[in-house]
Amino acid sequence: MPLLPPSRQKDISNPLLKKIIVDVNNSRHNFIAFLWHALFLAFVTTFIDVNTVFSSLVLKIGGSSFHVGMLTGIAVGLPLVTQLLFAGFLAGRTRKKPFLLMGIYLRVLSLAGMGYTLAIAEKSDPSILMFTVFLWVGLFATSGAFAGISYTDILGKALPKSERRRFLISKQAIASVAMLSSALVVRHLVIALPYPKNYMVIFIIAAALLFIATGGFWAIREAPGKVSPLSRMLKVLKAIPHVLKNDKNLSNYILLINASSLGLTVIPFYIALSKARFGLSGHQIGNYLLLQFVGMALSTIIWKKIANRYKFKGISFCYALMGGLLPLLALVLSRTSIDFFQWIFFFSGFVISAGKISIEGILLEITTNDNRAIYAGISGTLSLTTAIFPLIAGMLIERYTFSTVFIFASPVIFSSIFFLKRIQCKP
């Protein structure tokens, strides 16, 4: 909706006022376009959830905790550690939208490929099937890194600072409702259809939904940005020590995400713990998925109230606190019954939503339009624990116990609160 009706707009002669009207109209247009993408991406997120859908698929194929760790390392860690490569390339481009769309279409291809692979799964050797699944996950994760940097940069340029917090909260609210409804669909598919047909249908639908989601980005009006002097990877690598030394916000942010991310990367191992203690049926997978997304939906209401008073740092504090408590609670509840243990996934929904809102929000507040792509690449590449922890955790669980990993993870996650307090977000 225009700020003023056409009859009034033609009477405006002040160039500054004209610019304000155009900027406000573009902001509203982009706000809606981003929400369109967020809505359909939320549907997709449920269908390809790493914590439940992917992890259970690996276990169904015949994998172990080690394979779950490898999967998590690829799906969560690979996009982060490859960001620097893409950040240098993208920093040399004034417009990021074409590269954002390319990254998303590669993700559509990988999901469709996953569906085809599972369509012929019964004729495939389990080892080859596992390897092929990991290849598709690798393509999905890498193209996600390419798209993710572009997304963050465009979001920073397309929405004024005054609109970003409202957008991120609105995005999570819409996403939570969408994910909750799609969780019911995925739960039904997992239970009603036999393996591997259920997973095949899930990934084909996910590919179609992600394709529809790109419509929002086609509609975005992207303003051209400046070309960063750090537009080549070698220059970026050489500049990292200087950037970290001169920007304490960035260095503390990197330490924050390294410590707090363990709260997210440990979640897939709750599925492995469930299989070890209670078995793993389609009914269980469906219930875990549903409880996780119910938690995400309900938590959005709480995060909105916290954001209004304490901003993104308040949400990040809750993210670290709950993320640190959950592994210990999982160990306790795993010694009871599945009726109690399944609520771990409900509370993991709180952790996931808090992480998505706060980590992205804090990055927006400590960066500018000129350095955002580079900072996203640096922080992602230096998120070493996100990539390495799942691999080490999987091996330790195979060799020792779940207690070894979970008890180690909790204090590390709690330590992120120290780095959070040292970050100065711009008002």
Provide a role label for each language-model segment.
Residues 214-231, 421-427:
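Helix-loop junctions on the cytosolic side of multi-pass membrane transporters
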Residues 113-117, 121, 140, 217, ...:
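MFS-fold secondary transporters
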Residues 2-81, 90, 112, 249-289:
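Helix-loop boundary and gating motifs at the non-cytosolic
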Residues 65, 95-96, 130, 161, ...:
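Membrane-helix interface/capping residues of multi-pass secondary transporters
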Residues 116-134, 332-344:
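Helix-loop junctions at membrane interfaces in 12-TM secondary transporters
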